Design a protein with these regions (language model features):
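Positively charged, polar, low-complexity stretches
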Residues: 1-97
Length: 97
């Protein structure tokens, strides 16, 4: 799924008020974290992930998260990642872009 710049801007504005749902701490990014991110993406579609640790590797971890979950990186602002994945069921999609 490739997003246009207009779609990315719309998603950024929708994400502005969101709080981070997942925190990447000293335990790092493991299989349980990826499972949790997948579950949250299915429920929310658009979410924020905060890097409390591994701040120097946030771009690398963001790529891994996007690859493993099939999501799109919308932006990394400070130590917060914004990702989006369309719900597989069109009737359950909360975000229409």
């Amino acid at each position: 799924m490739t997003l246009t710049s207009k779609q990315v801007q719309e998603l950024k504005s929708l994400a502005h008020h969101l709080n981070p749902i997942v925190l990447i701490g000293k335990g790092g990014l493991d299989e349980a974290q990826l499972e949790n991110i997948n579950k949250e993406l299915l429920h929310h579609e658009l979410m924020k992930i905060k890097f409390n640790d591994y701040k120097s590797r946030k771009e690398e971890l963001a790529e891994k998260i996007a690859e493993e979950t099939g999501s799109e990186i919308i932006d990394i602002i400070g130590n917060t990642l914004i990702i989006y994945r369309k719900h597989p069921n069109p009737e359950e999609r909360q975000i229409k872009i």
